[in-house]
Every structure is written in C-alpha cells, then in structure tokens.
Curated annotation (Swiss-Prot):
SUPFAM superfamilies: RNA-binding domain, RBD, Winged helix' DNA-binding domain. Disulfide bonds: none annotated. Core component of the 7SK RNP complex, at least composed of 7SK RNA, LARP7, MEPCE, HEXIM1 (or HEXIM2) and P-TEFb (composed of CDK9 and CCNT1/cyclin-T1). Interacts with METTL16. Interacts with RBM7; upon genotoxic stress this interaction is enhanced, triggering the release of inactive P-TEFb complex from the core, yielding to P-TEFb complex activation. Associates with box C/D small nucleolar ribonucleoprotein (snoRNP) complexes. Residues 23-117 form the HTH La-type RNA-binding domain. This is La-related protein 7. There is a cross-link at K232, K408 (Glycyl lysine isopeptide (Lys-Gly) (interchain with G-Cter in SUMO2)). It comes from Rattus norvegicus.
Length: 571
C-alpha cells in the first residue's frame, strides 16, 4: 500500500511540474523593443527616415501597423511576435497603441526640423573596422545624451567607411565630446577629413597661393621677433657696462654704449674669462649652446637684487639711485629674455602642452573613461572641409576635361595630316555603311563543321587569316559548328580551295552557304545586331564618364609605348 501511495505522489508531483509553465525572461527583450521603437518614432530619426515618415503621412490618423515594424531587420533580431511588441509599448512615452493593440502612432505630432542640428552633431574618424552603433553610443554617451548615430557604409562591400556622425541633445554636450574625445594618435594624418589634398602628388594652385600667403605672414612675424631680440641684446650689453662702472659715476644706457668702442684691447677680455672660470669652478657647468656671461652679469642675476633697491631707497632715493634701480630692472628683464633662448622657449611650449594633456587625462579619469585614439570635430568644420574637397575635385575634373579635348584635337590633326587627299569622302561612306550594318553579299559565308569542339574564336580566325582576310567569326565556346564571314566571294573561294590541307591539319569540313540557308543566316545577323544595339547601357555621367575616358586614353598610350620598334638597315 505504501509503495502505491508513493507512486501516486510521484506522478502527481510530475504532473504539477509539467503544468507549471516555464518562466520566460522577457524583461530585457521588452526594454530593448521599447527603446528601438522609441528611437524609430523619435524626432531625430523621423526627420531623417523618409520611408517611416511617408508611412505615417499615408494614414489619416497617423497609425502604423505593428507588422511593418516586424519586417525591419533590427526588430527581427529581437522578436517577430506582434503581441510582445504591443506589450513592450504599453508604458512608452513616445508612442501609443490603438484599442485593438495592432497599430501604433506618435503621442505628439512631428514638428519642424531643428536649425541647430549641425551644431549639435560631431564628426568622428579613425574608428575601428567593425564599429557598431552600440560601441559609439557607449563611448560618446559619457559626454551626453546621444540622439542619433550615422555610420556610412560602402555600397559594394557593406564595410564601414571609417567615420561617423554623432548627434547630441545639446550644443554643450557636442562641445564636451570634441574636448575630451579628440585624441588622435601621432601617426594619424595632420588634416582631418578623408579627402585627397593633392592632384598627381602636386598641390593645387588655388591652395598653393593661400599657403604662400600664410608663409609670408609667418616670415614677417619671425623677422620682427629677430629685430626685437637684437635690440634687447644691445640694451643688455649697454646696461651691463653701466652697472660695472656704477661706483665711479652713474650713467645712462646710451652713455655706456658710447663708451664701448671696437678699439678696446683683446687681452683684458681673455683675463676676464679666466677669472670667470676660476670663480665658477665650484659651480656646475652651464649647458652647451648657452652664452657665457661675465661675473658682473652673474652677480646682478643673483637673488640679492631687492636688497640693493631697498638700500637705494633708504639712502634718500636721489636721482642717481633711481637710475641705478632702473638699470637693474632693465638688466633683470633682458637677462631673463636672453636666458629664454629658442630652445628654452620650445621647452616651455612643450611643457605647457604636456600640462594641458595631463589636465585632459585627469578629467577623463574623473569621467571614468578609457582613452581611445579618435579624431573628433564639429560637423560645421567638416562641412567646410567637404566644400574645400569639392572645389579641388571640380578644378581637377576641369583640367582633365581640357587635357582630353587637347589629346583628341592632336589625334585628329595627325590623322588628317597622314591621310591622302580625297580619303575623307571614303571614310564618310564607310561610316554610313557601318551605321546601317553589314550588307547582303552572296557567296561570302563559309560553314565550318568539326567532330570535336572548336577552339576559340581568335584561334579559328588566325588559322583562316593565313589564307584570306576574315571579317567575322560567329562561334560560341564549346560549339562544333561555326560560320566565317569573308570580305569578298573570292576570299571564301580561296579558303574552299585549301579545304584538303585544313581537313588534314584540323579535321574540319567546310562548305559555302547558298540559297535559303544563306538568306536565313543573313536574317540572323541582322536580328542579333539589332538585339545588341537595343541592350540597356550603363549611363556614365560627370566624374565617372571623365575618368573612364582618361583610362581609355592611358591604356591606348601604354599599348603604343610597349610596341616593339623595328629599324631598317637604312635608318
């Protein structure tokens, strides 16, 4: 009895387990669906998404069927269940469901496109190859609320082009992204934007002029700086001489400079240098490239300057004392200017740059952000670069057009000069005939039959061309039958006369078409020609058309250059 009771208990528990439905974890899926639909029906997307905007405008009440959303690829990845989508959108702040729960629409009507859209958008380049929307949102989301992301792709391969546009909610957020995320690596190109800056590895004249103007301005600035430095050096020399003789009589800087004449003896200067070396023996050696200074200058540059000034003030502050203090101030200023030589100035600028870089890094660490090597700039700046690129493209295409027209004219002139008189009329008649198509001539077509598949069209033509001139070979690959068209009946007859030799070598059977067979074949020629002419052609316009023309000319020139030139004995 006990065993039976246990069995019944086990069966009941199993039934209960089966009856209990498995808990489906759809909370994250519902959140993802709501986020995706809110984005699709948001202001930022609808102003750019023409298809969805048209679907909303088509319906009178602005409702869109949920089945349309299910057809989108991103929604297919999340779910294909319309009821689940309706469940996810019940608490949405952007869209609302109809009474049946099968259609959705925006709660608020779509307004006009905002004017500050470009100012709120940033351009990003040097992105990783397999970049995604979620990656960009994660990186740029730390600077503000990302409203829209556009990643352009190549049509042929579908790979990302390496740059993207990120739209923020406010201008301040965009500026913050430019400040903190603009961190291009050292090996990155100097100029931003994926645009060519040269034509045939040479700068374009319009750009060259602007660059030359900039260089001239820089040169003028350098010359002015050099002049000011020279003037300061003169002031320093004069002031130093004045200070050294200040005990005898207080002098002005101009008097000191007059006293120093080029006729001064050279030996005392050498002695002075020796004294300097003896005095500064205990001190560390000065760096290479810096000017050696006299002991008087060193004394003046030492810290106890303010004491001298104080003494002068205490002594009564007479005119002599005031002049000395002025000279000291001038000397202080000039010596500091001299100490800051070009190398030191560069060092200062580098140190400032390092400080700024450190500050940025600190702020980045505060934000809790990883440093990613990206180049970020405003969309307005990128638009200016785009205009520059289009102007360059226009100029290069205009020059290409000119060169192509010149080459054509030259070739026409050459053909006219080489052609004998009266050949122009013959050429025009030939052109008319070619426009009409091949004219019916009897006894010109030879039918070739073979047991094995015939070789290529070129091989057949080469074999027959040894006997007489061939106009056309009508042959498909792998066929055992073909037709050869000759210029005159005599040429066709010559091939027929050599039939025995051809049969021995290639085992081909030849016959000239005549009667109904010939007429049918000529009709086939005309029908095939008409079908070929009526085929839809790819229309090439603008830059593509010019480039194809240039490519043809280049190929023709290379073929001409690669031809083997043979010289006769008399040349």
């Amino acid at each position: 009895m006990e065993t039976e009771n246990q069995k019944t208990m086990e069966e009941s528990t199993e039934k209960r387990k089966e009856e209990k439905k498995k808990r489906s974890r759809v909370k994250q899926v519902l959140a993802d669906i709501a986020k995706q639909v809110d984005f699709w029906f948001g202001d930022a997307n609808l102003h750019k998404d023409r298809f969805l905007r048209e679907q909303i405008e088509k319906s009178r009440d602005g409702y869109v069927d949920i089945s349309l959303l299910v057809s989108f690829n991103k929604m297919k990845k999340l779910t294909t269940d319309g009821k689940l989508i309706a469940r996810a959108l019940k608490s949405s702040s952007v869209v609302e469901l109809d009474l049946e729960g099968t259609r959705i629409r925006r709660k608020k009507p779509l307004g006009e496109r905002p004017k500050d859209e470009e100012e709120r958008t940033v351009y990003v380049e040097l992105l990783p190859k397999n970049v995604t929307h979620s990656w960009i949102e994660r990186v740029f989301g730390k600077c503000g609320n990302v409203v829209y992301i556009s990643i352009p792709h190549y049509k042929s391969t579908g790979d990302p082009k390496g740059f993207a546009f990120v739209e923020f909610e406010t201008k301040e957020q965009a500026a913050k992204a430019i400040e903190f995320l603009n961190n291009p690596p050292e090996e990155a190109p100097r100029k931003p934007g994926i645009f060519p800056k040269t034509v045939k590895n040479k700068p374009i004249p319009s750009l060259r002029v602007a660059e030359e103007k900039k260089k001239k301005k820089k040169k003028k600035g350098r010359i002015k700086k050099e002049e000011s430095v020279q003037a300061k050096e003169l002031v320093v020399d004069s002031s130093s001489s004045g200070v050294s003789k200040a005990t005898k009589r207080p002098r002005t800087a101009s008097e000191g400079s007059e006293a120093e004449t080029p006729e001064a003896p050279k030996q005392p200067a050498k002695k002075k240098k020796k004294r300097d070396k003896v005095e500064t023996g205990g001190l560390p050696e000065s760096k290479a490239g810096k000017r050696e200074r006299s002991s008087a200058e060193d004394e003046d540059c030492l810290p106890p300057r303010p004491k001298l000034k104080k003494r002068a003030q205490k002594d009564g502050g007479g005119p002599a004392a005031s002049e000395v203090s002025k000279e000291h101030r001038d000397l202080e200023f000039c010596s500091t200017e001299e100490e800051k030589e070009p190398g030191d100035r560069k060092g200062d600028s580098l140190s400032k740059g390092k400080r700024k870089h450190k500050k940025k890094h600190k702020e980045r660490h505060k934000m809790g952000e990883e440093v990613i090597p990206l180049r970020v700039l405003s969309k307005t700046e990128w638009m200016d670069l785009k205009k520059e690129y289009l102007a360059l493209q226009k100029a290069s295409m205009a020059s290409l057009k000119k060169t192509i027209s010149q080459i054509k004219l030259e070739s026409e002139m050459e053909t006219e000069s080489k052609a004998p008189p009266g050949s122009g009329q013959q050429c025009s008649t030939q052109e008319k005939v070619s426009a009409q198509g091949p004219q019916f001539v009897t006894g010109v077509i030879v039918k070739i039959l073979s047991e094995d598949p015939l070789p290529g069209r070129k091989q057949v033509k080469d074999i027959l061309a040894t006997i007489s001139e061939v106009v056309y070979i009508d042959l498909l690959e792998g066929d055992t039958e073909c037709h050869a068209r000759f210029k005159t009946p005599e040429d066709a007859q010559a091939v027929m006369n050599a039939q025995t030799e051809i049969k021995k070598k290639h085992s081909w059977n030849l016959e000239i078409l005549s009667g109904d067979h010939e007429q049918r074949y000529w009709q086939k020629i005309l029908v095939d020609r008409q079908a070929k002419l009526n085929q839809p052609r790819e229309k090439k316009r603008g830059t593509e058309k010019l480039i194809t023309k240039a490519e043809k000319i280049r190929l023709a020139k290379t073929q001409q250059a690669s031809q083997h030139i043979r010289f006769s004995e008399y040349d």
